[in-house]
Amino acid sequence: MDHKLSETEQYLWNFIEHHILEIPNYSIVKLSEQANVSTATIVRTMKKKVYEGFTSFKHHLKEGENKNINFSFLDKVDKGIRRAILKNEQEVVRTINMLEIGNIEDAIQKIKFADRVFVFARGFSEMIGQEMLVKLQLTGKNCQMHTDPEIIKSISQKLTKKDSVIFVSLNGETKELVTAAKNCYDAEIGSILVTANHSSTLKDYCEINLVGFKSEGSYFPDYEVRSRLPLQIIARILLDAYALRMGEN
């Protein structure tokens, strides 16, 4: 199934995110009336968001509110604060649930047996890349990071099959990273992708894909400063697992 939302489905998802506290109490008919969309649109949107249906989505929200987050000491908390907390909670929980253990194991092995590990990242994702660089170096791994677009493209053409590359990209469409990934793909260089976009171009070129959940809305819509929380979660799990594995050896 194509997970890309249509214009109407995107409108609905934005409506849901802006009314996230009320949604658990809505029926599908009421949501249809409030958002002025058909029930069929609601069902399609839920499917694309990897839910079985609207009831499944509501169940997830209720579970998150009643079990994972305790608001009992914040009875009068501002709705905006609650919405922000729930949005972050959703990114954490769904990212963890989406991770495939087999891919994490493959990534650990790829890093372990590489002579050198290169981390490529741009923009806000550079912060995640920097953390990965430091932690890999602390385990004794020969690792380096590059953020300059021209250097990234140049180095990607000089790697050997004994190297591995980690691409860190929220949307997986950054041009210089795509170019570098294609170079690695053509030269059969091992690659790992940390992203939050299931259908990205980078995903097509990378050998091992670790994909997290990214909420659609942004509280800073005029700027490219979207949350990298899903990438942070993936990076931490991968690096913690790698460090534990190296400690066992």
What is the meaning of each model-derived region?
Residues 102-114:
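Glycine-rich phosphate/diphosphate-binding loops that line cofactor/substrate pockets in enzymes
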Residues 112-233, 237-246:
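Glycine-rich phosphate-binding loops that contact phosphosugars or nucleotide phosphates
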Residues 5-8, 18-25, 33-39, 45-105:
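HTH-adjacent hinge/linker in prokaryotic transcriptional regulators
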Residues 1-2:
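Short, Lys/Arg-enriched N-terminal segment that forms or immediately precedes the first helix
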